[in-house]
Design a protein with these regions (language model features):
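C-terminal/domain-edge helix-coil "capping" segments
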Residues: 1-59, 63-71, 82, 86-90, ...
Length: 123
């Protein structure tokens, strides 16, 4: 549609996150369902800092989602790259991370274009 190239618009997207495995991840999942992303991210950070392997990978993945919601795409990519380094090669988690990376890069590109378009209205 041509109008989408002229005016900014909202597009609803679906994102996945991990919410099991330990108490902090389960509690963070509750916070997400309550739309309390700050509290969820604090718990994910704690899991990320004190765990290794799959738990750390899942927390990094979730932190990437948090930073995407905050429009901090550079930080989101950092955490997603970290999650990818911890995921088993060829695992379903690695595939999910790869798919999310493509989505994140596309969203970052659209966001930069929107920022460029909106600069026209700055004094």
């Amino acid at each position: 549609m041509l109008i989408q190239n002229i005016l900014p618009y909202w597009k609803e997207v679906e994102r996945y996150y991990f919410d099991g495995g330990n108490v902090d991840m389960r509690d963070a999942g509750v916070y997400v369902r309550e739309q309390n992303w700050e509290e969820a991210s604090a718990l994910w950070r704690r899991v990320y800092n004190v765990n290794k392997g799959k738990k750390k990978m899942r927390a990094a993945f979730n932190l990437a989602l948090y930073y995407e919601l905050e429009s901090d795409f550079a930080k989101a990519k950092e955490y997603l790259i970290e999650a990818a380094s911890l995921a088993g090669e060829g695992s379903w988690e690695a595939q999910l991370i790869g798919f999310y990376m493509l989505q994140l890069e596309e969203q970052d590109k659209r966001n930069r274009l929107l920022e460029l378009q909106m600069k026209r209205f700055e004094p």
